[in-house]
UniProtKB/Swiss-Prot annotation:
InterPro entries xrefs: PsdUridine_synth_cat_dom_sf (IPR020103), PsdUridine_synth_N (IPR002501), PUA_sf (IPR036974), tRNA_psdUridine_synth_TruB (IPR014780), tRNA_sdUridine_synth_fam1_C (IPR015240), TruB_C (IPR032819)
Protein's organism: Haemophilus influenzae (strain ATCC 51907 / DSM 11121 / KW20 / Rd)
Protein name (record): tRNA pseudouridine synthase B
GO molecular function: pseudouridine synthase activity; RNA binding; tRNA pseudouridine(55) synthase activity
Gene that produces this protein: truB
Gene3D superfamilies for this protein: Pseudouridine synthase, PUA domain
Role description: Responsible for synthesis of pseudouridine from uracil-55 in the psi GC loop of transfer RNAs.
First-level EC class: isomerase
EC number: 5.4.99.25
UniProt record similarity statement: Belongs to the pseudouridine synthase TruB family. Type 1 subfamily.
Active-site residues from the entry: D48
SUPFAM superfamilies to which the protein is assigned, alphabetical: Pseudouridine synthase
Presence of the UniProt keyword Transit peptide in the record: no
Record Pfam families: TruB-C_2, TruB_C_2, TruB_N
One of the protein's GO biological processes: tRNA modification
């Protein structure tokens, strides 16, 4: 007798997953999606299989706002092994060069200085960036090297934690688009000994609280023991993905007009500079507005289900 098919459902919010080592971000995202029986899911910036830590999973309407988390700052704890370079710049690759390590802590501290602030970084070949529609890692696996342009990134903090030769542990607070593997590889070259990542843990995305993270095995246990309503309580509200944007609350008349897809007048346009989070008179999150020649939400949530609204 066959098992009854799961009923997929509309469920909205952000789940803070503590990603385990050894799984791809997409595979673990699909598992979370199945456990919540969600119609839609998306992650907010891939972590390498080697890496662990915070991976926000957007469900339902929250997927419309995942780009804001992709663009958010990140924090990492990383351990590098000095003296060895690998083809992937991490422990999953093949060692391609071995050099002697004879460093004092002060030499490392001095080398770190040049990696702080606004810098340029050439992405690793083992990345998901695309060239002619194909991910770079596919070229790399075929032994093909593609020329990549250096990209601007910002290292807000690069803190020395521990050096127990040949292992060096650092804490990194960085902008979007930063490859920690490349950062470690570049540091190894500056130090003259080479280096690769042996441990990588993402400790923060935007302002999400670390205490809210949950491992997949705990989520699995809850899913097996409790109804879906209990799992839903683990979800953070959709608007947390855009919590850094200023909020604009509509009055009852404006909310009513929005519901009918009508134009809405604002008494104070200064409230609408840049992007804002839009809330109804009942404090329901409606979406994000961008300032152009007129106002229209770039995305809006399930409450209204309108893709574009004109504003005056």
């Amino acid at each position: 007798m066959s098992r009854p098919r799961k009923r997929w459902r509309d469920v909205d919010g952000v789940f803070l997953l503590d990603k385990p080592q050894g799984m791809s971000s997409n595979d673990i995202m699909q598992k979370v999606k199945r456990l919540f029986q969600a119609n839609k899911a998306g992650h907010t910036g891939a972590l390498d299989p080697l890496a662990t830590g915070m991976l926000p999973i957007c469900l339902g309407e929250a997927t419309k706002f995942s780009q804001f988390l992709l663009d958010a700052d990140k924090r990492y704890l990383v351990t590098a092994k000095l003296g060895e370079r690998t083809d992937t710049s991490d422990a999953e690759g093949q060692v391609v060069e071995t050099r002697e390590v004879n460093l004092e802590t002060q030499q490392i501290l001095t080398a770190l200085e040049q990696f702080r602030g606004d810098i340029l970084q050439v992405p690793t070949m083992f990345s998901a960036l695309k060239h002619n529609g194909k991910p770079l890692y596919e070229y790399a696996r075929q032994g093909i090297t593609v020329e990549r342009e250096a990209r601007p990134i910002t290292i807000f903090e690069l803190n020395f934690i521990e050096y127990n030769a040949p292992f060096l542990t650092l804490e990194v607070h960085c902008s979007k688009g930063t490859y920690i593997r490349t950062l470690v590889d570049d540091l190894g070259e500056v130090l003259g000994c080479g280096a690769h990542v042996t441990m990588l843990r993402r400790t923060a995305v935007a302002d999400y609280p670390v205490a809210e993270m949950m491992p997949i095995n705990e989520l699995q246990l809850l899913a097996e023991s409790f109804p879906l309503s209990e799992l839903d309580r683990l979800l953070l509200p959709t608007d947390t993905a855009v919590s850094k944007l200023p909020a604009l609350h509509l009055d009852a008349e404006q909310s009513k007009a929005i519901g009918f897809g009508q134009r809405v007048k604002f008494a104070n346009e200064q409230q609408l500079s840049g992007q804002v989070r839009l809330f109804s008179a009942e404090n329901l999150f409606l979406g994000v507005l961008n300032r152009r020649e007129y106002y229209s939400p770039t995305t809006i949530n399930y409450t209204i289900r309108i893709t574009s609204l004109p504003f005056l």
